[in-house]
Amino acid sequence: PLSEEAKIILTNNFNNTDQILVPDLILYELANAWATKTKFSPYRVKNNLKDLEEINLSIEPVSLDLIRKAIAFSRRYKVTVYDATYVILAKGKKCKLVTADDKFVMQVKLPFVKHLSEY
C-alpha cells in the first residue's frame, strides 16, 4: 500500500535530491534473507545484487561506538539492536529515518523518525 511513497524515495535518490543512508549490516541482512528465507534462484539473487548496486545506497560502516549507542538505545526503547542501529545512524548524520513500521515509530517517538506515509 505504501509502495508509491517508497518509489518516490528511490526516484529522489536516483535524481540526487535525496540520499539513502544505511548501515553496512543491511548487506548481511539482505544476503541472509535471499539465501535462507527465500527460494530465489542464483540468477534472481544476482539480479537483486545488481539492482542493489544501482540504487546507489550510501553505506555507512558500523563502528563499535555506534553499536554501544545502539545497545543503550535498544534497552531504553525496547527495540532490537538492529533497529536501534538505524536510529543512531540517522541521529548521528542528522537525517530522517523513514520506516513503514507503525509500531516502531510509535514506540520511539522521536521527531526525526518518520513513517513512510509522512514522506
Residue ranges and their predicted role:
Residues 21-22, 61, 81-84, 99:
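Short beta-strand scaffold positions
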Residues 26, 66, 86, 103-104:
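Alpha-helix capping/helix-boundary segments
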Residues 60, 87-119:
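Acidic, PIN/NYN-like endoribonuclease modules and their adjacent C-terminal/linker elements
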Residues 1-22, 37-46, 119:
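Short, well-structured N-terminal submotif of metal-dependent ribonuclease cores
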Residues 1, 24-26, 46-75:
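Acidic catalytic patch
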